[in-house]
Every structure is written in structure tokens, then in C-alpha cells.
Design a protein with these regions (language model features):
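Phosphoinositide system proteins, centered on phosphoinositide phosphatases
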Residues: 111-118
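Active-site-adjacent, His/Asp/Glu-enriched structural segments that form or flank metal-binding
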Residues: 118-121, 136-139
Length: 173
């Protein structure tokens, strides 16, 4: 973690109208900086928003940061943290069944079937979780756009940030 009073105060100023529009008490939502060059922000431990310093440094203007704040608030009011844990549990059940069947097949002398069942079960978990994650991200984006509109702020920042993140993802592939 890194402490910077100026950045923390700016983030608090940017966040306040969004928190209020979302029905959140600004005094109960924590904001922290993580000394990391990546373009990332996330919600964890209830109502705490963490910003990587790389996201702050690479943002071309305050609207980009404000858009990210709105997106992260979308995760908070959408209850995405609590739903993620249950989604992981739900996705793991078929994998566990496939693993048990796969081990049974291995013990019965059918290694190809056993490995296919185990691998297939893991693949199903990955696909279910990625689908769930995409749905949460889309939901947070919709909430963010609504919050920006409700507070009279431009959506251009979040759109440009999405483009920047998409470009970064393409470059890393």
C-alpha cells in the first residue's frame, strides 16, 4: 500500500457524489492505493475500493478515474463479492463429480476416459466462472453509466478507460 494525501483527497472528492447517488455512506467506503504499475482497481473486504497506482498514472484525465470509481461502486451495490463466492461453489460441484467419475475410470483401467472426465470438469468450471465474471462486469458497467448520468458527469471517461484496458489486453495476448 502507498499513502498519498493529495491523491486520497482527490479520490474522495471524485467518489463522494457517486457514493451518495448509489445510496452509500461515503464514510463507510474505504479507498486505498496499491503501489503497482498495472491498470487495475477492485473491490475487496466489503466496501473497500483499491486502486493500483498505474491506473491513476495512466489515466489521461479525472473523468477516466471517476468512471472507474463508478464501475467499482457498481460492484459494491450489485453485491458482486458475496455472489462470487457462491458462484465458485456452484461451479465446482460438476467438476467434483467429474473428478470422482474420472478417478473411478482411471482405477477401472480406462485412463483416456478418466483424464477426459477430469479435464472436461475443470473446463466447465472455467467457462462457468468466466461467464459469471463477464456478467458481473457488464452489470457494474451499466450501474456506472447510471451513476455518472445521475450525477451529471460524462460517460466519456469510462468509455476511454474501457478502450485503454481493451488495448492493454490485446497487447498482452
Amino acid at each position: 500500500f502507498i499513502r498519498d494525501a493529495e491523491i486520497e483527497n482527490l479520490l474522495a472528492d471524485y467518489s463522494r457524489p457517486l457514493f451518495l447517488a448509489a445510496g452509500l455512506n461515503p464514510n463507510t467506503v474505504g479507498i486505498a492505493l496499491i503501489n503497482n504499475k498495472s491498470l487495475n482497481a477492485f473491490v475487496a473486504n466489503g466496501q473497500n475500493i483499491y486502486f493500483h497506482t498505474g491506473l491513476i498514472l495512466e489515466s489521461e484525465d479525472p473523468n477516466m478515474v471517476i468512471g472507474v470509481i463508478a464501475h467499482e461502486i457498481g460492484h459494491i451495490i450489485g453485491g458482486h463479492l458475496s455472489r462470487k463466492a457462491s458462484a465458485i461453489d456452484e461451479a465446482q460441484r460438476p467438476a467434483l463429480v467429474a473428478t470422482i467419475l474420472g478417478l473411478g475410470s482411471l482405477l477401472a483401467g480406462a485412463p483416456d476416459v478418466g483424464l477426459a472426465l477430469i479435464t472436461g470438469g475443470q473446463h466447465v468450471v472455467q467457462r462457468k466462472f468466466l461467464s459469471f465474471n463477464r456478467a458481473q462486469e457488464s452489470s457494474a458497467d451499466v450501474i456506472a453509466l447510471r451513476l455518472l448520468e445521475d450525477t451529471g458527469q460524462s460517460p466519456n471517461g469510462i468509455i476511454r478507460m474501457m478502450d485503454m484496458l481493451a488495448d492493454q489486453e490485446i497487447l498482452s495476448e
